[in-house]
């Protein structure tokens, strides 16, 4: 054993796992994130994987990565660069080293750096460390061989044994961060409950990786420890945005006293919501995997008519197909939540990458005057709140609502404090009053202009809804010009009357020289950029929007308060254009990227500083 290891105390650290898309890097990263969140650290994760089901082994295009930022206190992003890089093959080292700090510790499986591996990764020599000019601490271990040695008496074949390589790497990283392996053991025994031999093999390999680090660490300068500084007591868990979204819908249905119906068609990156909700039939959840996107949305409209909290989920291409059924819900004035987990486009585009390019589509991408509330979740944990709020708006205002997330928020995870349902407000749909029995008409409204909801089967409230325009007074089909104009106004006024919270200004809200504006899943990166600039003595504030339509009442006041405003978004300026349409005389600076990747905080700081200095 080498000399006593120095334990370095850190407030935050970034770890990136990388390897072939079949090497289990997503599982290893998720499990390490769960361990960290469970012990009280804050986390922010970024799964980054190719669209291929299984890319050619060892290819540069087939590398799958998972980055997690762990903090003693609050962290806002997965981090620009990592402190520890796990590269399970030559291609991973070649493509992922750019994400490593100059001081990073690098872990490689030398068994996957053979001549053929190096050729696939376009290395020109047999020494990739020297060729790339890497001066970092490197743990170069024959991981594949050690895994096979560890499981030699397991009875597993060679291929099955090598599937455990990710657990060896996880054990080694857990050693680097002084993590207890108990949580990982429990997770694996639960995951492989029907295959206990597989669970125990993986557990054995995790311990082998941990022990290897403990006993053979002469090439590493130090290990790390990140203490928890969590100030809010409670039970925490690591949760992805998609899972939080599913839980938010379940909570809303419970508070409304309704069944939850999801009509969906599988599409990356939204499918996990369908998977999660399908596990909860005992909570009154009904899920239907339909034959296509159109059927998914149309069936949800039918479920809404029947009296359920109805949801349909998709990504950008699916919104194109669902638009007709969404418009049907608009004219029928039925509650519906449409979840759009945005991805790179247009067309099939970049299915596993993230953008904010669906904003104008969900605002205006339907025929006719078709007003619809739009919300955008700001983080993985905020997906729970946003799903609840979208459901509440839909049910209480009898309207379809679009909830925007994106691949970064949906697949990423964060430490989430389990909420108490009693702390959330009741949801009160505008059910038709019993005293209107016999005199009620389908488009009769309450004092807020919201159509009453009559559930089929109620005696005295038989009615028909449909896609043809209806007479406001009788509910009969009408082509009367004045009536159509009136109904168009009533549908718009109903949306305009929805009360949403004011947009909050953070940072130097009283005297900022630059206001950063964003919406949805870019919140963490923009907040981190603001923090860095303020630490340098610059006067900067942030206004981040969750409610897009209707906009908060104080939007114009905030936009006009500061001498310079920059709107930063992952599209070519859709939100900036929307704000210009809504706020007279508003001419902001713009920061636009459409790379399929999250913002890089250092690049944001440089761009915002340049604007500030103009």
Give the predicted meaning of each segment.
Residues 13-20, 169-171, 260-263, 310-313, ...:
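Short glycine-rich or small-residue beta-strand-to-loop segments that form or flank ligand, phosphate
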Residues 134-136, 140-144, 353-402, 406, ...:
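Conserved thiamine diphosphate
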Residues 69, 87, 107-109, 139-142, ...:
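Short beta-strand segments
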Residues 12-100, 247, 252, 260-261, ...:
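Thiamine diphosphate
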Residues 50-54, 113-117, 146, 294-296, ...:
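Short gly/pro/ser/thr-enriched loop/turn and capping motifs at secondary-structure boundaries
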Residues 231, 238-248, 256, 386, ...:
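Flexible, low-complexity linker and terminal segments
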Residues 2-256:
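Active-site cofactor/cluster-binding pocket
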Residues 52, 149-151, 218-234, 252-259, ...:
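Gly-rich Lys/Arg/Thr-decorated short loops/hinges at beta-loop-alpha junctions or inter-strand turns
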């Amino acid at each position: 054993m080498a000399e006593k290891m120095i334990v370095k105390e850190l407030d935050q650290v970034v770890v990136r796992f990388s390897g072939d898309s079949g090497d289990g890097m997503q599982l290893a990263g998720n499990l390490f994130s769960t361990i960290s969140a469970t012990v009280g650290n804050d986390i922010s994760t970024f799964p980054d994987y190719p669209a291929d089901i299984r890319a050619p082994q060892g290819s540069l295009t087939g590398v799958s990565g998972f980055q997690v930022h762990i903090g003693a206190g609050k962290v806002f992003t997965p981090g620009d660069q990592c402190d520890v890089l796990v590269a399970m093959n030559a291609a991973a080292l070649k493509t992922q080293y750019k994400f490593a700090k100059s001081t990073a510790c690098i872990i490689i499986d030398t068994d996957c750096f053979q001549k053929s591996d190096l050729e696939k990764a376009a290395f020109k020599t047999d020494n990739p460390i020297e060729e790339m000019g890497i001066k970092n601490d490197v743990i170069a271990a024959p991981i594949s061989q050690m895994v096979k040695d560890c499981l030699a008496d397991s009875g597993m074949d060679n291929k099955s044994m090598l599937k455990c390589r990710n657990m060896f790497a996880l054990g080694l990283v857990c050693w680097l961060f002084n993590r207890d392996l108990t949580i990982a053991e429990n997770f694996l025994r639960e995951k492989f409950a029907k295959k206990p031999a597989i669970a125990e093999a993986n557990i054995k390999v995790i311990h082998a990786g941990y022990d290897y680090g403990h006993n053979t660490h002469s090439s590493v300068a130090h290990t790390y420890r990140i203490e928890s500084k969590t100030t809010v007591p409670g039970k925490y868990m690591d949760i992805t945005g998609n899972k939080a979204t599913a839980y938010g819908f379940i909570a809303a249905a419970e508070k409304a006293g309704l069944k939850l119906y999801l009509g969906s068609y599988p599409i990356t990156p939204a499918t996990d919501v369908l998977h999660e909700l399908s596990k909860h039939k005992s909570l009154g959840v009904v899920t239907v995997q339909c034959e296509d996107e159109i059927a998914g949305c149309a069936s949800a409209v039918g479920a809404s008519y029947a009296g359920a909290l109805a949801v349909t989920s998709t990504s950008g291409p699916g919104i194109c197909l669902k638009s007709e059924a969404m418009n049907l819900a608009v004219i029928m004035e039925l509650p519906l939540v449409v979840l759009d987990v945005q991805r790179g486009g247009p067309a099939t585009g970049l299915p596993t990458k993230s953008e904010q390019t669906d904003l104008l589509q969900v605002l205006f991408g339907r025929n006719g005057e078709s007003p619809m509330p739009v919300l955008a979740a700001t983080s993985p944990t905020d997906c729970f709140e946003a799903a609840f709020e979208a459901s509440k708006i839909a049910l209480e205002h009898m309207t379809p609502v679009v909830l925007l997330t994106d691949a970064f928020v949906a697949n990423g995870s964060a430490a989430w404090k389990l909420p108490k349902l009693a702390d959330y407000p009741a949801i009160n749909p505008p059910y038709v009053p019993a005293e209107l029995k016999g005199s009620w008409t389908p488009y009769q409204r309450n004092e807020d202009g919201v159509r009453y909801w009559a559930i089929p089967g109620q005696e005295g409230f038989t009615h028909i809804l449909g896609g043809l325009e209806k007479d406001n007074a009788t509910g009969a089909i009408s082509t009367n010009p004045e009536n159509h104009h009136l109904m168009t106004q009533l549908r718009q006024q109903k949306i305009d009357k929805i009360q949403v919270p004011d947009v909050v200004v953070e940072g130097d809200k009283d005297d900022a020289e630059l206001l950063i504006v964003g919406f949805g899943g870019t919140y963490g990166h923009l907040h981190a950029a603001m923090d860095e600039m303020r630490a340098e003595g610059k006067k900067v504030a942030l206004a981040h929007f969750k409610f897009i339509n209707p906009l908060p009442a104080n939007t114009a006041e905030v936009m006009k308060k500061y001498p310079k405003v920059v709107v930063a978004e992952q599209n070519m300026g859709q939100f900036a254009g929307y704000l210009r349409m809504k706020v007279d005389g508003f001419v902001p600076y713009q920061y636009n990227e459409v790379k399929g990747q999250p913002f890089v905080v250092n690049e944001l700081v440089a761009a915002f500083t340049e604007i500030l200095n103009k």
